[in-house]
Amino acid sequence: MDMDSAHLDSSLLTLAFRLIKAAQTAAPSVLADLLAEGAPAWFQDDDLGWSCLHYAAERKEPECLEVLLQGGAVWNAVDKWGRTAGEICLSLGDEEGWSIIRNEGIRSEMLHHALSGTSSPDATNNIVLRAEDKTSAGDNLVFLKSKLTWDVGKDGKERVLDADGNGVMMGWEEPLMVEHVKRLTEEHPKAELGAEGMSILNVGFGLGIVDRLFQECDPKPSHHTIIEAHPQVLEYIHKKGVHLLPNVRILQGRWQDWLLDGEKVGDVLSGTPDGMGFDAIFVDTFAEGYEDLKAFFEVIPDILNADNGRFSFWNGLGATNPTIYAVSSSLAELHLEDVGLQVEWHDVLIPESMREEVWKGVRRRYWDLPGYRLPIAKMSLI
């Protein structure tokens, strides 16, 4: 919503600046009157890139925030430093104000999906959480044609970069993947010593960290399917001999090719016990947005074992901004509930050193938060 003031006629521009000024000191009724006159609530000033919502957040007056949001203020508009009004609230210790903005984000995103009438990953609607991006980092089809590079970062850990220098998979994520595998397998009856082992589905190989961790479990997986689409990653898989490991099966292609095709779903399930679904499913794709993740949610009931199955995903959408990250996580929880899954969240601390050193030599930083919200979803008990 960062629109140039040149697009406004003089009368609207005057109203926009009046609203910006009023948001700093005026009563909520004055803000409501200006909005009723047509003042553009999305407008951001040139000095700070602040909207009326940013200025109102600085006042710590919740009613002003509510009036502005009802009048069209944009909950996730960012200033010149990438901060939403929610971060202004957080910096001032205003939990109530932050909750108002977060809840509006959840409401507007849920409304977006309800009105879009589709969850297809090919839909033209772009979720507000993620702007349109036709680079290899923002478009999965572009990414699948891009050249990848494997190297070692300044932190001494292996990483995969795309042709634009964006991190596809980076070694710093391994402690988080350890937690994912731990939460997906702990106390599962098939993961106990002497048991037959779990059936695993992983979508998106990357550096193979999560697949290696699953293979290190005792007992090892009784079945382990990996869906991967990038040609170079598939070459890497064969170079490492992953496809030769016992009970491992590689399905080449996008997950949409396999799981949105009714006939192929049966092939995917063919290796699970009695074809009744996987015991653990993990998804971590690159250059896909929330629409794609939501579409994946909707196939989970068809491929997850209903009794003890667990599902998790790389929870990285909006992870450079705490307010957007909170909205994204809440939205995912609500949409998982829509398809019959209950989510438990596990908070994992990310050390400051890990958040700084790893980004040297990487074009686009995709993480900038002190904590990670790890989701574990299970089918709801009726």
From Swiss-Prot:
InterPro entries: Ankyrin_rpt, Ankyrin_rpt-contain_sf, Arginine_N-MeTrfase_2, RMT2/GAMT_Mtase, RMT2_dom, SAM-dependent_MTases_sf
EC primary class: transferase
Sequence ranges of the ANK repeats: 22-46, 48-80
One Gene Ontology cellular component: nucleus
Predominant location: cytoplasm
Domain RMT2: 134-382
Keyword rRNA-binding found: no
PROSITE patterns per UniProt: ANK_REP_REGION, ANK_REPEAT, SAM_RMT2
Superkingdom as given in the UniProt entry: Eukaryota
Functional description taken from the UniProt entry: S-adenosyl-L-methionine-dependent protein-arginine N-methyltransferase that methylates the delta-nitrogen atom of arginine residues to form N5-methylarginine (type IV) in target proteins. Monomethylates ribosomal protein L12.
Family: Belongs to the class I-like SAM-binding methyltransferase superfamily. RMT2 methyltransferase family.
Subunit and partners: Monomer.
Listed name of the protein: Protein arginine N-methyltransferase 2
Organism: Cryptococcus neoformans var. neoformans serotype D (strain JEC21 / ATCC MYA-565) (Filobasidiella neoformans)
Lineage of the species this protein comes from: Eukaryota, Fungi, Dikarya, Basidiomycota, Agaricomycotina
